[in-house]
Amino acid sequence: VRIAEETKEVDALIFVGLPLEYNGKLYNVAAGLNHGEILGFVPKTWLPNYNEFYEARYFTSGEHVDGTVHIDREAYKERYDSDFDDVEFDIEMTSFDGFEELEEIDDEDFGGENFDDEDLFDDDEMDDELYEEDIWISPNTIFTCEDMPKLQIAAEICEDLWVPNPPSVAHAFHGANLIVNLSASDEVVGKDSYRKSLVSAQSARLLCGYIYATAGEGESTQDVVYGGHNLIAENGSVLAESKRFANGVIYADLDIHRLDNERRRMTTCQFAPDLAPEGKDISYNEAPFTLENTETVLTRKFDSRPFVPGIKEERERRCDEILNIQAMGLKKRLAHIHCQNAVIGLSGGLDSTLALLVTVRAFDMLGMDRS
């Protein structure tokens, strides 16, 4: 609640990780915030309980959670203390089967005798309609931008990405084209390369943007070390990557319209709200948010020759691949019709030169005399 209040003037969709008690269970959740509003809580689905991970000791999987959390901001305002660790507020749990439970918290000791909430809250600045909120808690939530209808965002948490069937797969089938991952992935020798390839591959499989933010070096403990390895990927390409073991910010320009076009072009898997992977009859909640649609300086660089690699070794490998693909096709055709020679009309241009090179390679593959 406090973070939402502090960021209500920030024009951004912000995700914050936190533990949340719901119906007597503790969940590891990502909260989506926008202009002072808490849009929804997304609980973690897959809980690691191997090697250095012990999440199942404390948390419950949120795979089947689908309900609302009622937050009374007026109660929070009255009980607010300058020490954030002591902040508590009334939470009413409501699920769709009609279960309701209201937990009353004794606030006798909140604030102390010198506590003055007027110094901390301004009634004129705090919207009356936000005093009480019913907020979704469900892994099946898509955050939709009212100002950019094609931008649809979903969240998953750390281990959710590392399993064979990540929640982001269903998110993508229901329209999400940008996935955010709030992670606490510790550092082990070689793990950064695997992590990077995982993020890149997932963005390619789902034809989406993928933002991966992990715990920083200041959160390391005696048991694990965190390197703050943050990544931004789009359709298989890593657009930004942070330096490990250093705090900082990364950013990148994502081409949402390009992703949308790629999804229309790839008809094998239809990305639409009414479709999902086989056996996944899932209903999704929409959490609308707003962003000011303004022009900014483009930081992303686009190559004027996108099909010609700038690195010499990669360029030579690409040219050799082109020759092999064409020569293999010609080889198959020559063998099929039992042809022992070829006639090429040479104009001296690039096309006829390429035709000659392809023919020579095809003859070599067949073991035929070039002459």
Regions found by a protein language model. Give the residues of each.
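Enzyme catalytic cores with a strong preference for nitrogen-chemistry domains
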Residues: 1-103, 117, 122-345, 355-370
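Residue-identity detector for glycine
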Residues: 98, 111-112
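Conserved G/P- and acidic residue-centered "switch" motifs that form tight phosphate/ATP-binding loops
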Residues: 349
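Catalytic nucleophile loop
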Residues: 352
